[in-house]
């Protein structure tokens, strides 16, 4: 499916251990990133990776997507990494897991979008050619700038 897609884009949404401790990104980050990507990648095919099946079942990103969420993330982590790096472009979370998937994409014309704000002040973690999008962290529906 991903390999057959002409303009595949992965979106990684990290929740899991980030939820409740103030580390998960607000969904507006992914929406802004998708708006940016849609202007540059015609007919993009989105593949969403997340470890929270309940969350993705009700997710509205403003664009149609294929939900790649699996029930057992620990057993499927290597497979998700392989699938994400098989995409042509990527939108990463504030996670080194999706950072590596994006870094390993072989497309020399790849567009990678990452959050401007990372944990613990690691603001320069993105590669220089990657696009930084403004982001914030969410805690129990309250927004805090990182």
What are these regions (language model features)?
Residues 10, 65-67, 112, 130-132, ...:
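Conserved beta-strand scaffold positions in the cores of enzyme catalytic domains, especially
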Residues 1-75:
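Core catalytic architecture of nucleotide-activated donor-dependent transferases building glycoconjugates
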Residues 121-146:
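Leloir-type glycosyltransferase catalytic cores
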């Amino acid at each position: 499916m991903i390999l057959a897609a002409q303009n595949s884009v992965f979106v990684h949404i990290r929740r899991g251990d980030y939820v409740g401790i103030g580390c998960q990104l607000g969904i507006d980050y992914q929406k802004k990133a998708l708006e940016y990507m849609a202007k540059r990648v015609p007919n993009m095919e989105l593949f969403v990776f997340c470890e929270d099946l309940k969350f993705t079942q009700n997710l509205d990103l403003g664009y149609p997507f294929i939900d790649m969420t699996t029930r057992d993330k620990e057993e499927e982590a290597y497979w998700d990494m392989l699938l994400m790096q098989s995409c042509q472009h990527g939108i990463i979370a504030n996670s080194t897991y999706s950072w590596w998937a994006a870094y390993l994409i072989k497309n020399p014309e790849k567009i990678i979008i990452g959050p401007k704000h990372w944990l613990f002040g690691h603001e320069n973690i993105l590669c220089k050619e990657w696009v930084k999008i403004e982001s914030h962290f969410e805690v129990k529906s309250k927004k805090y700038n990182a």
